[in-house]
């Protein structure tokens, strides 16, 4: 049996169903991709704290994801939508083929895209997208590569916008004991 250690994914647990959004990029995620409906799966989840939901569902919240870091934002978007809000997503990837389930995000709210190769949306990184110059967001949640999240956090800090980041690190225990999930930080 394969061990899945700390891969970013979206887990929706509703009405006795477990729904996973994963990118099959390692041994553990490839094993998950081979599962069929009715197969048995031992899970220890949820781990960590997750994102803070907005108190006011009408709050203009931007969910920024890069690479496989977009997966947890899908769950957050569902939670916001179920509370009557309409999330905005800013998703980045190397190419359009690297974007995970774009249509699922589009069902939940506004979706803005950047690709490094200009194959979809605006060319560049998420922090280069024109929506950041046009719209005023009251909160930002981000998940993805560390350099991207640092850029997003700096953008938010410079504008006085509350920003939450979600680590995409490999985390062996998920409980804090092995310290893989610990990160030294300073204000952006």
Regions found by a protein language model. Give the residues of each.
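Single conserved hydrophobic/aromatic residue that forms the stacking wall/gate
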Residues: 1-6, 11, 185-188
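Local cysteine-cluster metal-coordination motifs and their immediate loop/turn environment
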Residues: 169-187
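Ferredoxin-reductase
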Residues: 5-39
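FNR/FR-type flavoprotein reductase catalytic core
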Residues: 27-172
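Functionally engaged cysteine thiol sites
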Residues: 3, 10, 117, 143, ...
